[in-house]
Amino acid sequence: MVHKIDRSLQIKDRDVYDLILVIPPGKVSTYGDIANALGHPKAARLIGNILKKNPNPIHVPCHRIVKSNGKLGGYMYGKQMKKELLETEGIRFHDCDNLRDFDKCRIGFNMWDA
């Protein structure tokens, strides 16, 4: 299977980082939510690739970005560290990888659409 690359995507790393900066402790968003908020609903994978290159994960809290199914997703310091960071912010888990009350702690960014 050949995948076409959409060369029209104009998502800049800085735009992704700026959006993540508004996610408060104790809340999460998804790769898809970030892509939607930036006007590119099919760019969730691109968002993940941008976050892999996050030069300052302490300042830009990319640990607050999870998969759309409520699972952790990747993190440059490993899933266990991502889970521990989220737990210190009040996020709870069903097991090692699934967020409890995912819909309650998720921010979808529609509050900025007005």
List each language-model region with its residue ranges.
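Nucleic acid-binding interface residues in structured DNA/RNA-binding domains
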Residues: 2-114
